[in-house]
Curated annotation (Swiss-Prot):
NADP(+) binds at residues 35-40, 92-93, 114-118, 129, 189, 215, 220. The gene is bre-1. Disulfide bonds: none annotated. Catalyzes the conversion of GDP-D-mannose to GDP-4-dehydro-6-deoxy-D-mannose. Involved in susceptibility to pore-forming crystal toxins in conjunction with bre-2, bre-3 and bre-4. Has a role in determining brood size. Belongs to the NAD(P)-dependent epimerase/dehydratase family. GDP-mannose 4,6-dehydratase subfamily. Its EC number is 4.2.1.47. GO terms for molecular function: GDP-mannose 4,6-dehydratase activity. One of its GO terms (biological process) is 'de novo' GDP-L-fucose biosynthetic process. Its cofactor is NADP(+). InterPro entries: GDP_Man_deHydtase, NAD(P)-bd_dom, NAD(P)-bd_dom_sf. It is an enzyme of class 4 (lyase). This is GDP-mannose 4,6 dehydratase 1.
Length: 377
């Protein structure tokens, strides 16, 4: 298959590829990761390289460097030997021709689609862009695979989200729980979810959704609430900051560790048949409880006073460490998310092992080290 010529004139008929040809194709172990420079993409790249894959990643062109999370891989001579185990390519989920070109050139055996505008609150400010990237971008990537006649050969993973459940219809949420999205981000991801199902059913593509509940790590983006908390706690411990402003302290979430969740992504694509899975811990904590755990790591116990936007968290000396600001509330809040991971445990043999206290401990320690080395980080 050479260049774009192989992708022109593709019919919508379902092709049948001989088993021997499929086996030989998959034995190549070539992965393409969109969103490779993000939290999940960086952990997934590490995992796949450790399993002997050739890893290709798509990054967006930027005037500033945005590859900090994967710099250790890109500069590692072990991933830049003669067979080029790790490669990065410029691309964008809004550019169909670029995606077709990459798919036809790389011919991946597995595609992990992680790229997204993934900040829920930002999606209210940028609803059209969020839909363009998260919804239509997923379609573009699936259609690129189909256009390049790789529909039967490629295994496709779509990073779906617990935000699909939004105004939850049952607790806990499983693969059978009805969706009720409460943000432009969640609505866009719901389209992504169903277009994956559609391509699986229409073209017999090995296409899967991982409905991942919140997952964190020291590599989490600084604007997400968990990382915002641990960064602020680190700064407070070093005298660089006095307090932190947050939104809904009572919001309940099912938090896990991103490093474990990318293992689930890989297992989903190694399963015998394509399917959709909830990936979660099955345990729930509030934002307030996350704050308590984080401050405990620097020896401070918080006492909470007031309600709503008047609520504050004070240390034993009466110093206010946590304040509530209306600007961090979403127009439509998602009050509670709790996943039921039984299907993943039974079918994939996957279950979360890192507890939330362990996760918080790791994140706070990492941010303290970061702030000591670079107070302006």
């Amino acid at each position: 298959m050479e260049g774009l010529e192989a992708c022109i004139g593709q019919s919508h008929e379902v092709m049948t590829t001989p088993a021997a040809e499929l086996a030989a194709f998959r034995a190549r172990k070539v992965a393409l990761i969109t969103g490779i420079s993000g939290q999940d993409g960086s952990y997934l790249a590490e995992l796949l390289l450790s399993k002997g894959y050739k890893v290709h990643g798509i990054i967006r062109r930027s005037s500033s460097f945005n590859t900090a999370r994967i710099e250790h891989l890109y500069s590692n001579p072990m991933t830049h030997n003669g067979d080029s185990s790790f490669s990065l390519h410029y691309g964008d989920m809004t550019d169909s021709s670029c995606l077709i070109k990459l798919i036809s050139t790389i011919e991946p055996t597995e595609v992990y689609h992680l790229a997204a505008q993934s900040h829920v609150k930002v999606s209210f400010d940028l609803p059209e862009y969020t839909a363009e990237v998260d919804a239509v971008g997923t379609l573009r990537l699936l259609d690129a695979i189909h256009a390049c006649r790789l529909t039967e050969k490629v295994r496709f993973y779509q990073a779906s989200t617990s935000e699909l459940y939004g105004k939850v219809q049952e607790i806990p949420q499983s693969e059978k729980t009805p969706f009720y999205p409460r943000s432009p981000y969640a609505v866009a991801k719901m389209y992504g979810y169903w277009i994956v199902v559609n391509y699986r059913e229409a073209y017999k593509m090995f296409a899967c959704n991982g409905i991942l509940f919140n997952h964190e790590s020291p590599r989490r983006g600084e604007t997400f609430v968990t990382r915002k908390i641990t960064r602020s706690v680190a700064k407070i411990s070093l005298g660089q900051q006095e307090s932190i402003e947050l939104g809904n302290l009572s919001a309940l979430r099912d938090w896990g560790h991103a490093r474990e969740y990318v293992e689930a992504m890989w297992r989903i694509l190694q399963h015998d048949a394509p399917d959709d899975f909830v990936i979660a811990t099955g345990k729930q904590f509030s934002v307030r409880e996350f704050c308590n755990l984080a401050f405990a790591e620097i020896g401070e116990v918080l006492e909470w006073e007031g309600e709503g936007v008047e609520e504050v968290g004070k240390n034993k000396d009466g110093i206010v460490r946590v304040k509530v600001s209306p600007k961090y509330y979403r127009p439509t809040e998602v009050e509670t998310l709790l996943g039921n991971p039984e299907k993943a445990k039974k079918t994939l043999g996957w279950e979360a092992k890192v507890t939330v206290p362990e996760l918080v401990k790791e994140m706070v320690a990492s941010d303290i080290a970061l702030m000591k080395a670079n107070p302006m980080a």
